[in-house]
Amino acid sequence: MKSAQYKVEKRCRICSKKKLLNLINLGNQPLANRLNSKIPKKDLKFPLNLCMCKDCKTVQIKETVNPKILFEKYFWQTSTSVAARRFSKIFCKKIISYLECKNPFVLEIASNDGTFLIPFKEKGLEVLGVDPAKNLAPISSKKKIPVITGFFNKKIVKKIIKIRKKKSRLSFCQKRYRSCKKHSRDS
């Protein structure tokens, strides 16, 4: 298998220490959501090894598949899950309760088919999705959810600023964040 298709992590994904302990080798596995039942032997397969950092105890996979392989054509759609659609409305209501600015702009990174942006749009908020899956962008567009296709990076941020025609800060309601932080320390 080509090394451009995946890389083996040498450091912990959380603490960056080089103390990875191999736990379970699950052999070569097809990508989730990419199973081709007609020709299973043609499915791309990648090593799947579970390891644990001896330092911070985080259990993680040892191999990282190239994101383009994983996400440029993505098959699962958020809208297929009744629970996700229901939760998107609850999530929207909760986030709106934290907002302290007029005319907020909602940006969802990894927006999939736009399901989580729909409730915000229905409330009259400006929304934009960013997702690398080229096959999901048309689905979002049909739902009148604007989307930029690509991996979230500086280039995408520049596109967003250009689309909005002004520099915009994405802020996290500082006042509420501080009170949540204080509350979590008290618990």
Model-assigned labels for residue ranges:
Residues 1-83:
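N-terminal juxtadomain amphipathic helix
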Residues 126-131:
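Conserved SAM-binding motif I beta-strand of class I
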